[in-house]
């Protein structure tokens, strides 16, 4: 019987999150270019009769402090408005507006090919994503007076620019919305599903405000914090960002494109480098979506929306999970996290196991020999809710045993461990000689 001894760095790392804004996924430029038409002659401006606009009362016009809406709802009736009813199409649950550069039809041959968008396809796919989020996941409860969506449609804004833009959130604590450029719609797929996922995440808190289940909290700087649906960061007084938005928008989009949890290989590559970190760590905000598969397999698909809808400031998602499903027992939470991590070893999740790629199971943990043990390197030391997966070379016959010894927070690293501290891109920032000393026993 071969017997090896292994020191595991059971250390606790407090994760900080630095998303600039909830639901803001990506843009290739810092300032979003807008399509500003040449001022037409007054005689060329057309004004639409709002009484002839189907479902006009289902449109929430964003307040005047929002960019593009400074002149109010009436101005949108003009053909020269940036967002105009003359350049709009709608479906049962969505309005789509496009900028003037597209003309009357964003899919017309007169529009440069790189900027063409099939609006009918966009709306058709958006309706499918709506169905997924409402009927399958339960992110909004419609038809019972519990959601703004009973009386308003979500909003999509298409910008006339080649720079990549994909952002989902909402307006005025009331209605979900997304802003995209044509590249995200060629074809319409998981990117739009991801952004509509953000719109429904936003809708959770908007609906809580609508029903009175949540009340904004005034901050010292005059701003307000919405204490529901993770509309807050995990820093002091709700500062910072919430990587859970991105993790979940990924997972929500994969409900319609299940194979993409593996096909997007850049994400599982990031996961393999960072799974030892906190579940919500910013370094893997687009790649840490496996817990949601385990959660819904164990507790049912409705558990996903429960975490969102029943969250309470200042909880993070796992604290919400612990309260709902573990009777606030930290020991029970850790047992569940162990089960989750064990399933991650081979992606043993019924919903997606069939799509698994061998490259995605290339887990590794850097170890250093130290005093008769193998000690986990600082670069792979598990943070709170993170884990190590250490492959063993099993002989053809016989048994392999291991002795595990936990190390207290702040313990010394192995002598050969350089203690390299890295940033999100893997670049070295500094070095340490001890594991982090933050504890987590309550």
Give residue spans per PLM region.
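Zn2+-dependent metallopeptidase catalytic core
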Residues: 39-175, 179-196, 200-212, 414-420
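Zinc-dependent metallopeptidase catalytic helix centered on the HExxH motif
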Residues: 177-261
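Bacterial N-terminal signal peptides that target proteins for export
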Residues: 2-11
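Beta/coil-rich, acidic/histidine-enriched accessory regions frequently appended to metallopeptidases
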Residues: 314-442
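Active-site-proximal alpha-helical
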Residues: 269-335, 339-343
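Surface-exposed patches in mature extracellular/periplasmic domains of secreted proteins
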Residues: 134-153, 208-214, 235-242, 262-268, ...
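C-terminal motif of bacterial Sec signal peptides marking the signal peptidase cleavage site
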Residues: 20-24
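Bacterial lipoprotein signal-peptidase II cleavage site
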Residues: 25-33
